[in-house]
Structure formats: C-alpha cells, structure tokens
C-alpha cells in the first residue's frame, strides 16, 4: 500500500520486548526505566495476527527487534508462524548477539534469513563501557555463530560517537576486507533521555567516509546487500563485504521510507520520530480479526509524515528500548 506521499509501505519492524540484557548508553538510562508488565506486552498470537493483517496491506518484510529480541521466550515459534504467512518473504533480526551462539541455528531453521548485530567498538573496555557491562568476546561469538548458521548477510550496526569510537572507524571498515561482513556506520540520533548525553557527540557520516578513504583507499559504490534499508553501501578494493552509512541526521532518507513500527505494547507507529501511534492491543484483546487490524494499519500508513523532525527535538518521553530499535 502507498502512503500519502506515494511511498510503498512494505516493511514492519516489530519490537517483541522492551527488555534487554544490556543497557547501552544511547538506548536507555542506567536506571529508572520501568519494564512493561508481561500482561501489557503483545502475546505471540497477537503479533501473528498483526503480521497477517499487515500482509494484507502489502507488507512483505518483517524485522524482529527489542529491547533484545532474544530474551523473549518463544521467539523461534513466532518466527515459524510468521514465516508461513502468505506474502511475507523476508524475516530479519536485530540483536546484540550475546544470545546468538545457542540460538542461531534454530532461528535459521525457523525462518530467520539474516541478522544485524549491534557492535560499536572493537575494544573490550569500550564495549563494557557503552553497554554498561557487556562482554565483547560474547558478541563476537554471536557474530560467528550467525555466519556459521548461514544467516546471510550479517550486518554490523555501529553508532559513531565523538570522543568514544570515531578513532576506530578504519579498523571497523577493515572487518569487511576478508570476511563477508557488512559494517554500517550510523549517525547518532538524539532519542529519549540520551538526547542530552548525545549533545556534542554527533559525527556526520561524511567525516567517517573521509577518514576511511584516507587510510584504506576509495570507497566504491556497491550493490546493496539483501534486505534493502536506508544505508548507502560502498566497497573497499577486493573486499568480501561492504561498508554502509545511515545518515539519519545529515541527509535524511524519509522520501524512501517504507516502514512502520510496532511497539512491544502494541502501538503502531508510522514514524520513529513522530509521537503518534495507533493502539492495536486493545482491539486485538476485544476480538478484532485480521481485516479489522488491517484497516487500522492502513490508518497508520495514512498518518506517515513526509519526513522526520529530529532537529526540532525528541517528542516522546520513552526511551529507544521502549519504542523498538
């Protein structure tokens, strides 16, 4: 289905939980965030109904997010259900990777095709700092398990933060030379309580590109790996993988936006940076069927703004983990 601005909306990001086994500084504060009671989180069968309804409106791609999606019990069963829905041809997962070693094979068998793993640094001390206690070796084990399970492509999401990891961009890009990894540099976005923390830490993608090219040679435009999305991709000479840039702040890509977001509590959000949501949980629990939910999804599509307004400030009191990454 097309929205008001003739964009084809075919992608639904689903936050299956607001809980996480890490506490990354740009995603949630160290303390004070109230987790949703289990009764307020959409049940697996409710998520399945939403996906069936979304497929009726033209959604073809699903991404499961969190929080950390792998802390949600029954995730593999949800994937099996969703993968069998007519019209859904792609299921992906965004994760910190720590729980992947024991789950990657089962997720692949259930129907997950590919994964994005959050990895902001190659230094163990910095990883522990940015995640507030995470284990870098565990993340790497998860990345390797994804490769071994055949979850291709494996994309690494790296948020660039001035004063923290901008000195690692060359090393991160070098990961793509000998391995089939796709490193995506993401501009820091001011969201939730991290807005004040992010002040002064923003690094434009152009600066990262210049730093990589100066050390490793030209970045040649490359075909996009499977999955689409907003990143622009490049390849270093003879590299096995690609380097991507997501320019949410410096060069927005709203004219190409094809997505909706479903929060863990059942709110359908037309735009990450727009506070409007359509509640799907209440109708679901009042007995609404697939076609009724599809009608609400079409309402959400009609609400999609022409572009985000990040520079005007965050319009929601919730954290990124509560909305869905």
Curated annotation (Swiss-Prot):
[4Fe-4S] cluster 2 binds at residues 254, 257, 271. This is GTP 3',8-cyclase. GTP binds at residues 13, 63, 94, 155, 259-261. The lineage of its organism: Bacteria, Bacillati, Bacillota, Clostridia, Eubacteriales. S-adenosyl-L-methionine binds at residues 26, 67, 118, 189. Binds 2 [4Fe-4S] clusters. Binds 1 [4Fe-4S] cluster coordinated with 3 cysteines and an exchangeable S-adenosyl-L-methionine and 1 [4Fe-4S] cluster coordinated with 3 cysteines and the GTP-derived substrate. GO terms for biological process: Mo-molybdopterin cofactor biosynthetic process. Monomer and homodimer. InterPro entries: Aldolase_TIM, Elp3/MiaA/NifB-like_rSAM, MoaA, MoaA_NifB_PqqE_Fe-S-bd_CS, MoaA_twitch, MoCo_biosynth_MoaA/MoaC, rSAM. It comes from Pelotomaculum thermopropionicum (strain DSM 13744 / JCM 10971 / SI). Its cofactor is [4Fe-4S] cluster. Keywords: 4Fe-4S, GTP-binding, Iron, Iron-sulfur, Lyase, Metal-binding, Molybdenum cofactor biosynthesis, Nucleotide-binding, S-adenosyl-L-methionine. Residues 4-219 form the Radical SAM core domain. It comes from the Bacteria. It is an enzyme of class 4 (lyase). PROSITE patterns: MOAA_NIFB_PQQE (PS01305), RADICAL_SAM (PS51918). Pfam families: Fer4_12, Mob_synth_C, Radical_SAM. GO terms for molecular function: 4 iron, 4 sulfur cluster binding; cyclic pyranopterin monophosphate synthase activity; GTP 3',8'-cyclase activity; GTP binding; metal ion binding; S-adenosyl-L-methionine binding. Belongs to the radical SAM superfamily. MoaA family. It catalyses: GTP + AH2 + S-adenosyl-L-methionine = (8S)-3',8-cyclo-7,8-dihydroguanosine 5'-triphosphate + 5'-deoxyadenosine + L-methionine + A + H(+). HAMAP family: MoaA_B.
């Amino acid at each position: 289905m097309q929205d008001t601005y003739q964009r084809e909306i075919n992608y639904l990001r689903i936050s299956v939980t607001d809980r996480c086994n890490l506490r990354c500084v740009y995603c949630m504060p160290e303390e004070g965030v109230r987790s949703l009671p289990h009764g307020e989180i959409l049940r697996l069968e409710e998520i399945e109904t939403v996906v069936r309804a979304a497929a009726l409106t033209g959604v073809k791609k699903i991404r499961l997010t969190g929080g950390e999606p792998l802390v949600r019990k029954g995730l593999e069963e949800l994937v099996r259900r969703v993968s069998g829905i007519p019209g859904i041809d792609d299921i992906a997962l965004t994760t910190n990777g720590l729980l992947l070693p024991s789950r990657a094979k089962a997720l692949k068998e259930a129907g997950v095709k590919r994964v994005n793993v959050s990895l902001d640094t190659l230094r163990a001390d910095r990883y522990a700092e940015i995640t507030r206690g995470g284990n870098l070796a565990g993340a790497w084990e998860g990345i390797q398990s994804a490769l071994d399970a055949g979850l291709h492509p494996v994309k690494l999401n790296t948020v660039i933060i001035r004063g923290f990891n901008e000195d690692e961009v060359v090393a991160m890009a070098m990961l793509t030379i000998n391995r089939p990894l796709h490193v995506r540099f993401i501009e820091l976005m001011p969201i939730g309580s991290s807005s004040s923390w992010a002040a002064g830490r923003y690094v434009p993608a152009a600066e990262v590109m210049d730093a990589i090219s100066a050390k490793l040679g030209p970045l040649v435009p490359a075909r996009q790996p499977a999955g689409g999305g907003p990143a622009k991709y490049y390849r270093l000479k003879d590299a096995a993988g690609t380097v991507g840039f997501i320019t949410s702040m410096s060069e927005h890509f709203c004219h190409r936006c094809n997505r909706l977001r479903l929060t863990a509590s059942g709110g359908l959000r037309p735009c990450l940076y727009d506070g409007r949501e359509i509640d799907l949980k209440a109708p679901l629990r009042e007995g609404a069927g697939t076609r009724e939910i599809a009608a609400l999804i079409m309402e959400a599509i009609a609400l999609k703004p022409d572009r985000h307004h990040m520079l005007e400030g965050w319009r929601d009191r919730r954290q990124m983990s509560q909305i869905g990454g």
